[in-house]
Curated annotation (Swiss-Prot):
Family label: Belongs to the sodium:neurotransmitter symporter (SNF) (TC 2.A.22) family. SLC6A13 subfamily.
Record's subcellular location: Cell membrane; Basolateral cell membrane
Chemical reaction(s) catalysed: 4-aminobutanoate(out) + chloride(out) + 2 Na(+)(out) = 4-aminobutanoate(in) + chloride(in) + 2 Na(+)(in); taurine(out) + chloride(out) + 2 Na(+)(out) = taurine(in) + chloride(in) + 2 Na(+)(in); beta-alanine(out) + chloride(out) + 2 Na(+)(out) = beta-alanine(in) + chloride(in) + 2 Na(+)(in); hypotaurine(out) + chloride(out) + 2 Na(+)(out) = hypotaurine(in) + chloride(in) + 2 Na(+)(in)
Record-level GO BP terms: amino acid import across plasma membrane; amino acid transport; creatine transmembrane transport; gamma-aminobutyric acid import; gamma-aminobutyric acid reuptake; monocarboxylic acid transport; sodium ion transmembrane transport; taurine transmembrane transport
Ranges of compositional bias, category Polar residues: 1-13
CDD domains registered for this protein in UniProt: SLC6sbd_GAT2
Membrane association type: Multi-pass membrane protein
Function: Mediates sodium- and chloride-dependent transport of gamma-aminobutyric acid (GABA). Mediates transport of beta-alanine. Can also mediate transport of taurine and hypotaurine.
UniProt xrefs under SUPFAM superfamilies: SNF-like
Name under which the protein is recorded: Sodium- and chloride-dependent GABA transporter 2
TM region(s), chain numbering: 41-61, 68-88, 121-141, 207-227, 233-253, 282-302, 319-339, 366-386, 418-438, 453-473, 490-510, 528-548
Length: 602
């Protein structure tokens, strides 16, 4: 946590003061802290939202859903859902100076369950997202060799069906109906040692467990001192992946066949716009890549100074995120185009999404390049960094929420560090089940259900309804104006009121209608209890919102209408817009704490 305290100058402006010792409140709790500067906040948010989905999900969705035509539904969701909810969550954190749970308690107690729902998603996300880092670290360490281990069929884990690819004739070196490539055998038989189903978990993969332990150790020390350590680490973790991406992009576009790959990536097929699945993919991609409905943006925004221009930051970060996804598509599909030409097969046979791209398609392409170990190291180091800052910001979000809920317990010397250690240890131990021989099936359950687009859409519906219709869109706009000095684009307010809840509700209902049970590798079908477990993971977050509302209504005393009124009223200690305007002479904050009778029924 930052050790700054706020001082007030003669003209009323807030000015940071840097004491030598860590400042404490009157009750002995440590101060909450702020970012040292705007750049730390911007890089932290950039590190959170720019992650693996930008590299391995967006390019594939663009290719799959009509190439350049996919940008039409993508931009619709960007402006109607992505940017409005992104601003809503960031501004909410900055305005309340609270984490992902207590921020909602402050503005509308009856919807505090929104915070619990988002943190439940984050808890599950913290367990399984870092598994990808364990795999990437394993591949990274395996790349420090002259000959990449997935480049040939002469290893102990290879089977008699393994066949190396012959570039000269565009076919496998041999013929067999059961032929497999060395890349797939390395992934399934060396890395995963995958079993035949979720019912057979098998033994723990100790090498992957050590990689997971290393990932958690790195994650812990990135955030163990709060924003003081996080703000420094992101200077590297949020910027270095761009250097790696540029290097891979330059290498990719200079390869033969790159133009063919880029054409498949961008060539517009407008007829795909009539397929509702294309629109659903665009919507879920926005929610995944913008990290909304997770409480992370609220937590990061809560460490901003009150008058930080969060509106400008949000617009810039949203376009940076989308731009990164677009550019990453060139880097990925130029390589896939090269691989398609080398193998003499259609690009549809080499294009993959998710882990299939990172651990099968791209490693296969790297083998065909000169100095292949170098390019493998660059790629997997980029994957590690992309996942690392997304991971530790999610952990920071959970810790911030817990500390703000129980400040007298955790805002003491060294207790925050112990809390982070506890979260890391528990998440590490739970995550070990995904590193067993059947762990991949468990990982897929978490990925498909726990942090699915369905869960995020459900939370987004209530977020927009709560702020726009219960707290009041105009009131929240007044709060933002008080913070930044002017009112944001009016369309955003109407998105909160109408477009965002309508679009999210329609997409949520469509995802329910189009639901299909989970399969692995398009071959393995989960048993009924596997899908039931997945639905429990999904409902564990969604049920928090109605359950908390019913709990608070049931425990509060008084007439029903009075209980509703109390639970819909914001906290009295929230700062309100200065009636004289943001440029008016300084007014004591205490005179603005209470809402006027004209502004609220509370």
């Amino acid at each position: 946590m930052d050790s700054r305290v706020s001082g007030t100058t003669s003209n009323g402006e807030t000015k940071p003061v840097y004491p030598v010792m860590e400042k404490k409140e009157e009750d002995g709790t440590l101060e909450r802290g702020h970012w040292n500067n705007k750049m730390e906040f911007v890089l932290s948010v950039a590190g959170e939202i720019i992650g693996l989905g930008n590299v391995w999900r967006f390019p594939y969705l663009c290719y799959k859903n009509g190439g350049g035509a996919f940008f039409i539904p993508y931009l619709v969701f960007l402006f109607t859902c992505g940017i409005p909810v992104f601003l809503l969550e960031t501004a909410l954190g900055q305005y309340t100076s609270q984490g992902g749970v207590t921020a909602w308690r402050k503005i509308c107690p009856i919807f505090e369950g929104i915070g619990y729902a988002s943190q439940m998603i984050v808890i599950l996300l913290n367990v399984y997202y870092i598994i990808v880092l364990a795999w990437a670290l394993f591949y990274l360490f395996s790349s420090f060799t002259i000959d990449l281990p997935w480049g040939g069929c002469y290893h102990e884990w290879n089977t008699e069906h393994c066949m190396e690819f012959q570039k000269t004739n565009g076919s496998l070196n041999g013929t067999s109906e059961n032929a497999t490539s060395p890349v797939i055998e390395f992934w399934e038989r060396r890395v995963l040692k995958i079993s035949d189903g979720i019912q057979h978990l098998g033994a723990l993969r100790w090498e992957l467990a050590l990689c997971l332990l290393l990932a958690w150790v790195i994650c812990y020390f990135c955030i163990w001192k709060g924003v003081k350590s996080t703000g420094k680490v992101v200077y590297f973790t949020a910027t270095f992946p761009y250097l790696m991406l540029v290097v891979l992009l330059i290498r990719g576009v200079t390869l033969p066949g790159a133009a063919q790959g880029i054409q498949f990536y961008l060539y517009p097929n407008l007829t795909r716009l009539w397929d509702p699945q294309v629109w659903m993919d665009a919507g879920t991609q926005i929610f995944f890549s913008f990290a909304i409905c997770l409480g992370c943006l609220t937590a990061l925004g809560s460490y901003n100074k009150y008058h930080n221009n969060c509106y400008r930051d949000c617009i810039a970060l949203c376009f940076l995120n989308s731009g990164t996804s677009f550019v990453a598509g060139f880097a990925i599909f130029s390589i896939l185009g090269f691989m398609s030409q080398e193998q003499g097969v259609p690009i549809s046979e080499v294009a993959e999404s998710g882990p299939g791209l990172a651990f099968i398609a791209y490693p296969r392409a790297v083998v065909m390049l000169p100095f292949s170990p170098l390019w493998a190291c660059c790629f997997f180091f980029m994957v590690v960094l992309l996942g690392l800052d997304s991971q530790f910001v999610c952990v920071e979000s959970l810790v911030t929420a817990l500390v703000d809920m129980y400040p007298h317990v955790f805002r003491k010397k060294n207790r925050r560090e112990v809390l982070i250690l506890g979260v890391s240890v528990v998440s590490f131990l739970v995550g070990l089940i995904m590193l067993t021989e059947g762990g991949m099936y468990v990982f897929q359950l978490f990925d498909y259900y726990a942090a699915s687009g369905m869960c995020l859409l459900f939370v987004a519906i209530f977020e927009s309804l709560c702020v726009a219709w219960v707290y009041g869109a105009k009131r929240f706009y007044d709060n933002i104006e008080d913070m930044i000095g002017y009112r944001p684009w009016p369309l955003i307010k109407y998105c909160w009121l109408f477009l965002t809840p309508a679009v999210c509700t329609a997409t949520f209902l469509f995802s329910l209608i189009k639901y299909t049970p989970l399969t692995y590798n398009k071959k393995y079908t989960y048993p009924w209890w596997g899908d039931a477990l997945g639905w429990l993971l999904a409902l564990s977050s969604m049920v928090c919102i109605p359950a908390w509302s019913l709990y608070r209504l049931g425990t509060l005393k008084g007439p029903f209408r009075e209980r509703i009124r109390q639970l819909m009223c914001p906290a009295e200690d929230l700062p309100q817009r200065n009636p004289a305007g943001p440029s008016a002479p300084a007014t004591p904050r205490t005179s603005l704490l209470r809402l006027t009778e004209l502004e609220s029924h509370c």
